[in-house]
Amino acid sequence: MGAYKYLEELERKKQSDVLRFLQRVRVWEYRQKNVIHRAARPTRPDKARRLGYKAKQGFVIYRVRVRRGNRKRPVPKGATYGKPTNQGVNELKYQRSLRATAEERVGRRAANLRVLNSYWVNQDSTYKYFEVILVDPQHKAIRRDARYNWICNPVHKHREARGLTATGKKSRGINKGHKFNNTKAGRRKTWKRQNTLSLWRYRK
């Protein structure tokens, strides 16, 4: 069994004494740092590698913290100017994950890089902490690598903002196999197709 397998098993038992102590120490360290900061190396190398990270030039890791809880509707003085059914401000549940939010914020900070993937590293009562894997599309080491040079294509700019990363696709309900045919072509398109009555006229 390789070293990464042992790391994976350690991470799996998050309630063990070792991991609980380690997480407490790490979360204290993360709290002292900026909201978005660059990490020298991945905290979970086994997870990062499974998501596509390589310890070579052109790959960058950023760590980010996102506030936990609901998303408050940004309206001045709580005035939504609508019907009572739509007047909620506080108890609204954001339809995307905090991980997707983390990716988007890092993507805005490092606009010259492309977001490849991300993963959870820690959490406390107030924040969740994620590490985001970014790739430099201008770097020769990436452009010459047949496995990764697809991300250099301009259509992959800000893929995290368009729900094209793994967590973005998950919140869009996009996957393969049984039960996933209801989100074909997107949520709104599916709703429109299923709620539009179309009566075809046939002429001889």
Curated annotation (Swiss-Prot):
One of its GO terms (biological process) is cytoplasmic translation. GO terms for molecular function: RNA binding; structural constituent of ribosome. PROSITE patterns: RIBOSOMAL_L15E. Its main location: cytoplasm. Residues 169-185 have a biased composition (Basic residues). Keywords: Cytoplasm, Ribonucleoprotein, Ribosomal protein. It comes from the Eukaryota. It is found in: Cytoplasm. InterPro entries: Rbsml_eL15_core_dom_sf, Ribosomal_eL15, Ribosomal_eL15_CS, Ribosomal_uL23/eL15/eS24_sf. Residues 165-185 are annotated as: Disordered. Disulfide bonds: none annotated. One of its GO terms (cellular component) is cytosolic large ribosomal subunit. Component of the ribosome, a large ribonucleoprotein complex responsible for the synthesis of proteins in the cell. The small ribosomal subunit (SSU) binds messenger RNAs (mRNAs) and translates the encoded message by selecting cognate aminoacyl-transfer RNA (tRNA) molecules. The large subunit (LSU) contains the ribosomal catalytic site termed the peptidyl transferase center (PTC), which catalyzes the formation of peptide bonds, thereby polymerizing the amino acids delivered by tRNAs into a polypeptide chain. Present with 721 molecules/cell in log phase SD medium. There are 2 genes for eL15 in yeast. Component of the large ribosomal subunit (LSU). Mature yeast ribosomes consist of a small (40S) and a large (60S) subunit. The 40S small subunit contains 1 molecule of ribosomal RNA (18S rRNA) and 33 different proteins (encoded by 57 genes). The large 60S subunit contains 3 rRNA molecules (25S, 5.8S and 5S rRNA) and 46 different proteins (encoded by 81 genes). NCBIfam families: PRK04243.1. PANTHER family: LARGE RIBOSOMAL SUBUNIT PROTEIN EL15, RIBOSOMAL PROTEIN L15. Belongs to the eukaryotic ribosomal protein eL15 family. This is Large ribosomal subunit protein eL15B. The lineage of its organism: Eukaryota, Fungi, Dikarya, Ascomycota, Saccharomycotina. The gene is RPL15B.
